[in-house]
């Protein structure tokens, strides 16, 4: 039966430009099938720009209650959606071009004779699908399974799914089931009906919980504009990421150019493919003799050839060492991934206890086996947002930036390597040996047993050796240390100790001074020079607590005393030693302290004497100061 306004003789053979645009709108819009009103009546809901319901009836002619259909005299996007999505008609199929269909054509459409029939795997008995919680087990999802509400392929769309727990076990998008629940206006305690088997699907409360948890799977990269090719830099201008059109070399591995660099013809020797958005497949382009770029728009043929092209070229996707370096996570009994709604978006199955998940840089998580197989054999990017995992240019830069602190020069590399040598722990008195320039006397720094603030320049390089986390021995790399350590330390240090009183004393309070040596200068002549050893004692303000910090404070002196000391310091020779002894709380007798110090100094000298000899340095132009820090033994 013909409806008014339609003539049977009007048959279309070719796809018009306007109808093609409406088909593009239908395929790119978010439209949901809420209800089927007979075999040819459908209630649709469009998500954007606002949720609106539309009724579509197939017949002769087709009818839709939208505002576009009666005005244009052309099929609207809602009718196109039913023909292309619901009934899977090809865009150029004759039945998809007509303003209406006869009874025979509708009958063929309902029977699906235009589809390629594939054998369906046999279903097992329902009792074999019942799990411990009383639910039906979820059916395996294959490449042809679709969501009955949005009519999208499940494995291709990669959205979280739920399944019918009391009927057929088929999977449907969680988002689509929530839209259907809103249309049915059911209460939270009610059960939803399966749109496929018409049996109870699942409690609405469970669907809402799954929807809440699945929304947490959305990463920030998914919200980026599609014209941003995430993870892909331009190999010429280093723009990262490339925006707009992105060109990929068909012969070089992971070589990309932005629009500006491609127009500058900086890589003319090879051919390129291109894409405008990261969710699109790479399309071929050719250059004619007049150097005008010609785009090939045969989309279906190109998409088929692209996979064969990649296999033919033998392109390596993600290297194994890159994939194995991605973080792994073991699912434990307290993991949030066990909650309803969390699932691997590649296989669309829930996570289970004891499984391993792999985390991508974009924060998406998948089963380890699923994502490894994807990166090894299918694509070098995240299957959800398209962010490229590995690019030789960005990976090389990241590796260089990670070791940037070790570069600059060979001298700096050697200097840093010496500072990072393993710590040597020696119990006993800490020594600080440092080199001073000619004419400059060493000062008494404020000692911090955790870290000594000393200048670090390549010219004054030194080695750090930590002793019991108390202080550091700073050694200059010169020949003088090899010649003077054994003699000067063994000669000056014991003589100084021999001049001290040998009477035993008990525990010295931390705020008690040693008066016999406070204002006394002890001169110890040697065979080489006559060094002046100035003994200064200070009040210890700390008790070796958490930070193990000891602050040295100079005693107050009269102006006359300072002048005399300054005059004596001005006459010091470069080989002189400035020996400063700081005692802290101790509980041993002086004789025991002396023997302990001698034993530790002997071991230190034997260790220091084995230090490698560097380039020759004039010993007369240097001054070595010895600072002895008293520690609690």
Curated annotation (Swiss-Prot):
Record text on subunit structure and interactions: Dimer. Interacts with UBE2D1.
PANTHER family noted in UniProt: E3 UBIQUITIN-PROTEIN LIGASE ZSWIM2, RING FINGER AND SWIM DOMAIN-CONTAINING PROTEIN 2
ZnF endpoints (ZZ-type): 229-280
Tissue occurrence: Expression is testis-specific.
Known EC number: 2.3.2.27
Name of this protein: E3 ubiquitin-protein ligase ZSWIM2
Zn finger intervals (RING-type): 147-198, 344-388
Protein species of origin: Homo sapiens (Human)
Catalytic reaction list: S-ubiquitinyl-[E2 ubiquitin-conjugating enzyme]-L-cysteine + [acceptor protein]-L-lysine = [E2 ubiquitin-conjugating enzyme]-L-cysteine + N(6)-ubiquitinyl-[acceptor protein]-L-lysine
Binding site for Zn(2+) 2: 249, 252, 267, 270
